[in-house]
Amino acid sequence: MKQSAVVSKITQPYAEALLEMAQKYDIVETVNNDITLILNCLQNSTKLQQFLANPLVKKSSKKNFFEKTLAKEIHPYTFKFLLLVIDRGRISCLEIIAQKYQSLILKLTKTELAEVVTAVPLSSEQEAALNNIIKELTNANEVKLVFKIDQNLIGGFIINIGSKVVDASLLGQLLRIGNYLGLETV
């Protein structure tokens, strides 16, 4: 079994248990906000990731760190969940658990996450129109758009929704024409 499959098998039950607890106490949105905060902290600090992943750092030190930094910022149940993850020796997987929790929330709320890559920033009208189109295509209740700028596209856009890609960029069209004509590069 691949390492990513093993990690997924380990982390999924934690994310599911966190969601189940949040639903039981009707704090799904609060816990989601807490998880977003934790995920931002992890993604913005490689030192924090290294600290949490280091097996030589005692569990009590990791608990003390969270007690001093997050205990007053997050819901007590989210904090208890963090302590449980530390006690079980899975704190190095916290980022993956958090991402899986957010994926479960998206499924629960029938929200589709779409990454939109454009050459230039879109106007608010264009964003709203794109949001409505993606909603119709995916039958989602909500669409969460994440925008990235790539000036190499020249014009148009690329939309990534799960494993689906819609390439409506000028660069994509030029590359397809080049492939059709048998050219190596455009």
Swiss-Prot record:
According to the record, the segments passing through the membrane are none
- Chain segments annotated as coiled-coil in the UniProt record: none
> Quick one: where is this thing mainly located?
plastid
Alphabetized InterPro entries for the sequence: ATP_synth_OSCP/delta_N_sf, ATPase_OSCP/d_CS, ATPase_OSCP/dsu
Q: Which PROSITE patterns match?
A: ATPASE_DELTA
Sorted UniProt keywords: ATP synthesis, CF(1), Cyanelle, Hydrogen ion transport, Ion transport, Membrane, Plastid, Thylakoid, Transport
Cited Pfam families: OSCP
Name the SUPFAM superfamilies for this protein. N-terminal domain of the delta subunit of the F1F0-ATP synthase (SSF47928)
GO CC field = cyanelle thylakoid membrane; proton-transporting ATP synthase complex
Where it sits in the cell: the answer is: Plastid, Cyanelle thylakoid membrane
GO molecular function terms noted in the UniProt entry: proton-transporting ATP synthase activity, rotational mechanism
Q: What does this protein do?
A: F(1)F(0) ATP synthase produces ATP from ADP in the presence of a proton or sodium gradient. F-type ATPases consist of two structural domains, F(1) containing the extramembraneous catalytic core and F(0) containing the membrane proton channel, linked together by a central stalk and a peripheral stalk. During catalysis, ATP synthesis in the catalytic domain of F(1) is coupled via a rotary mechanism of the central stalk subunits to proton translocation.
Q: Which family does it belong to?
A: Belongs to the ATPase delta chain family.
On assembly, the entry states: F-type ATPases have 2 components, F(1) - the catalytic core - and F(0) - the membrane proton channel. F(1) has five subunits: alpha(3), beta(3), gamma(1), delta(1), epsilon(1). CF(0) has four main subunits: a(1), b(1), b'(1) and c(10-14). The alpha and beta chains form an alternating ring which encloses part of the gamma chain. F(1) is attached to F(0) by a central stalk formed by the gamma and epsilon chains, while a peripheral stalk is formed by the delta, b and b' chains.
Protein name in the entry = ATP synthase subunit delta, cyanelle
Origin organism is Cyanophora paradoxa
Q: Organism classification, top ranks? A: Eukaryota, Glaucocystophyceae, Cyanophoraceae, Cyanophora
Report the gene name: atpD
